[in-house]
Amino acid sequence: MDHQVSLPQSTTTGLSFKVHRQQRELVTPAKPTPRELKPLSDIDDQQGLRFQIPVIFFYRPNLSSDLDPVQVIKKALADALVYYYPFAGRLRELSNRKLAVDCTGEGVLFIEAEADVALAELEEADALLPPFPFLEELLFDVEGSSDVLNTPLLLVQVTRLKCCGFIFALRFNHTMTDGAGLSLFLKSLCELACGLHAPSVPPVWNRHLLTVSASEARVTHTHREYDDQVGIDVVATGHPLVSRSFFFRAEEISAIRKLLPPDLHNTSFEALSSFLWRCRTIALNPDPNTEMRLTCIINSRSKLRNPPLEPGYYGNVFVIPAAIATARDLIEKPLEFALRLIQETKSSVTEDYVRSVTALMATRGRPMFVASGNYIISDLRHFDLGKIDFGPWGKPVYGGTAKAGIALFPGVSFYVPFKNKKGETGTVVAISLPVRAMETFVAELNGVLNVSKG
């Protein structure tokens, strides 16, 4: 199957190339695996995680190696599924909307492809950052595979480039794992590709540790992130959306910090998130009394002590507390106001908070988080996705999420580490907004940063 890909003139140099895909196939575990039904946790199967997320990795050629990345990854995938065998199964919905993996061993979808383009051409065209205009060709959406239930839990496509580099793209069912869990799986995949006989960190299921019966559930905190939905999402209002990536070096983070009191300790996540939240609110121009939310996706593994989770636990272990303020306050008050809200929200997460979320899911039917007026940020910089190394080709030029927004929620951004063509390191943030709002957002962002730098 040959497909012509043309990159938009607005974001690239007009580069176009063809992708030839082989027939899709199912990769099954290399050895027999248990046939069993494994329930997900109460964190896993909430409504807000019932979608699939694409990630993508670009690798430079190694002309001194004659290994074929397609075959290396395909074999490693079959080997990895012996240890991560639930990924080779299919998701079923039980009573009370409880999800469970039917470990059938049917396998994961795998596509082999070739593209008549070199990595250097993509790099020159600034096409190695999300949103990737050619994503649908490098991670083909196999018909019927994008549902959550009764479909393969992983979709993998490996595309050889004419320079002998390659692109590794993967789509995963979010109910099965989070960023930390995906990193564990991919590291295991790399270890097996490089000759190890077993993952150095054995995978652990143990989803019962984050599951509670409705009769024993005790909601001990207020969880405004799961308020009943009210109002209309100011982003998803039917207006055409445009996505764009922004690159923040240490220089930009320092410029943002000049807007804050010098004695106010803060992390780069807090400084950048407060700044983006404020700029985004200005760009969307909502009614001044509209409640605006900044949802922090917080990895909670370190919070759990009774009992602690084993290092190989690869299920979802995050909570999504929301900082909430009116649009008027976000826009009119100093940036310190937004930053302190974020700090307070982060500090509210304790082990009891995590247990309270599991109880809420069990008693309220696994509700959806609030989408209206919500900006969701997930920091992937600590998950080592930029270190996914299959051997001769080294670390990826880019490794991380493939688009701004997720599923039906455009108001989501991921922080991804990146080194640009100049060798400068920083954080890439992809943002999706209506066209007019994006223009305002860019003007506000640049205006504030330029003044602060000056």
From Swiss-Prot:
pH dependence of this protein's activity: Optimum pH is 7.1-7.3.
Means of activity regulation: Inhibited by magnesium, calcium, cobalt, zinc and copper.
KO phenotype (gene knockout): Loss of (3Z)-hex-3-en-1-yl acetate production.
InterPro entries in UniProt: CAT-like_dom_sf (IPR023213), Plant_acyltransferase (IPR050898)
Free-text tissue specificity from the UniProt record: Expressed in leaves and stems. Lower levels in flowers and barely detected in roots and siliques.
UniProt keywords, alphabetically: Acyltransferase, Transferase
Superkingdom classification of source: Eukaryota
EC number(s) stated in the UniProt entry for this protein: 2.3.1.195
GO biological process, one term: green leaf volatile biosynthetic process
GO molecular function list: (Z)-3-hexen-1-ol acetyltransferase activity; acetyl CoA:(Z)-3-hexen-1-ol acetyltransferase activity
Induction annotation: Up-regulated by wounding with a peak 3 hours after wounding.
Catalytic reaction equation(s): (3Z)-hex-3-en-1-ol + acetyl-CoA = (3Z)-hex-3-en-1-yl acetate + CoA
Catalytic residues (positions): H174 (proton acceptor), D389 (proton acceptor)
Family label: Belongs to the plant acyltransferase family.
Role of this protein: Acyltransferase involved in the production of green leaf volatiles (GLVs). Uses acetyl-CoA as substrate, but not malonyl-CoA or benzoyl-CoA. Prefers primary, medium-chain-length, aliphatic alcohols.
Protein name per Swiss-Prot or TrEMBL: (Z)-3-hexen-1-ol acetyltransferase
Species of origin: Arabidopsis thaliana (Mouse-ear cress)
Name of the encoding gene: CHAT
